[in-house]
Amino acid sequence: MSQISERVIDLISEKLNVEKSEVTLEADFANNLGADSLDTVELIMDLEKEFNMNPIPNDESIAIKTVGDAIAYIESHANEAATKS
């Protein structure tokens, strides 16, 4: 598991108050982890802050529905930032 994955899982577990064992790549924020729409928006903002990211555009953030989606988005944008440096 990548360092990004571990940090994302830790943050989601803490913010949504769920056991880390429940935070799987397939876990849907709403259906599996009990997040409502406000929780999801706050979680996206926390991830942006944690990973020093620019705000995620709304059309892209609504596509982030699972833990795996969040990790993939962060990893791809972290790689883009690294290649621009």
Curated annotation (Swiss-Prot):
It is found in: Cytoplasm. Coiled coil: none annotated. InterPro entries: ACP, ACP-like_sf, PP-bd_ACP. Its main location: cytoplasm. It comes from the Bacteria. GO terms for cellular component: cytosol; membrane. GO terms for biological process: lipid A biosynthetic process. 4'-phosphopantetheine is transferred from CoA to a specific serine of apo-ACP by AcpS. This modification is essential for activity because fatty acids are bound in thioester linkage to the sulfhydryl of the prosthetic group. Residues 2-78 form the Carrier domain. The modification O-(pantetheine 4'-phosphoryl)serine is found at residue 37. Gene3D superfamilies: ACP-like. The keyword Lipid metabolism applies. One of its GO terms (molecular function) is acyl carrier activity. The keyword ATP-binding does not apply. Pfam families: PP-binding. Keywords: Cytoplasm, Fatty acid biosynthesis, Fatty acid metabolism, Lipid biosynthesis, Lipid metabolism, Phosphopantetheine, Phosphoprotein. Pathway: Lipid metabolism; fatty acid biosynthesis. PANTHER family: ACYL CARRIER PROTEIN, CARRIER DOMAIN-CONTAINING PROTEIN. Belongs to the acyl carrier protein (ACP) family. Carrier of the growing fatty acid chain in fatty acid biosynthesis. This is Acyl carrier protein. It comes from Azobacteroides pseudotrichonymphae genomovar. CFP2.
